[in-house]
Amino acid sequence: MKKNIGVVGCGIVGLLVSYKFSQLGHKVTIFEKDNGLNFSNCSATAAGMISPYCELIHSDKKIFELGETSLLKWKKIIKELNSRIFFKSKGSLVVTQIAEKSDLELICERVNSHTKSKLKILTNKQIQKLEPDIDSINLAGLFFKDEGQVDCLEIMNALIKFLKLNGSIIKFESHVEGIKKNTVSLKGGERINFDHVIECAGLDS
C-alpha cells in the first residue's frame, strides 16, 4: 500500500531514506531548514571516506561490517542514479614515522585478527611506489586496498534530482518546530499529517 512519508532533514541520511521510500513507490515530502543552495549540514562538508578497515582501528567488528557493506551499496546506488558522481575504491594509505612503527604493528595485528586480511607494514620504497609525491624516506605505512571515497555534494545533488524527477517534494527553508503522532509542525503554525515521519535532522537541528 502506498504511504505518505514525511522526512525531516535533507542531509545524506534524509536523502537516502527518501530515496529508498521513493523506490518502493511511496509519496515522500522532505523538510529542510536551509535554502538548498548553501547547505550548512555536516553532509556537505564531510570527506566522504568509506574506510571500514581504518574504522576498525578504534571501533568494533560491527562497524567494519557495516562499512564493508556500504562500499557495495554505494556502487549500486550510484549506478541506479546514472549521474556523474565522483566515487573511487582504490584504497587508503596510512603512513607514520619509522619511530612509530610499533603503532602500525598493533594496527596490523588488530585488523588481521578481525578480518581475512593479511596486512603487512610497507617499506618506504613501497610507499613511494603507491604515492610518488610523498617523501617516504623515514616513513612506514599500511595500505587498505579496498577502501574508497565518494563526493558527498555530488551524491546529494544526484539524489535531490532523482527525488524531484520521481515526484517527491522537497520543502527548503522549512523550519520544523515539532513532530508528534506523525504530524509535522512548521514555524508559522502549519501542521502536516503523514502516515509515517522519519526524523533525519542532524545535531542541534
Across the structure, where does each feature detected by a protein language model lie?
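Short loop/edge segments at beta-strand edges and connector loops
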Residues: E32, T123-N124, I170-S174
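Helical element adjacent to the flavin cofactor pocket in flavoenzyme catalytic cores
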Residues: L142-N182, L186, R191-H196, C200, ...
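Glycine-rich FAD pyrophosphate-binding loop
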Residues: Q23-A44
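N-terminal Rossmann-like FAD-binding beta1-loop-alpha1 element of flavoenzymes
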Residues: K3-T29
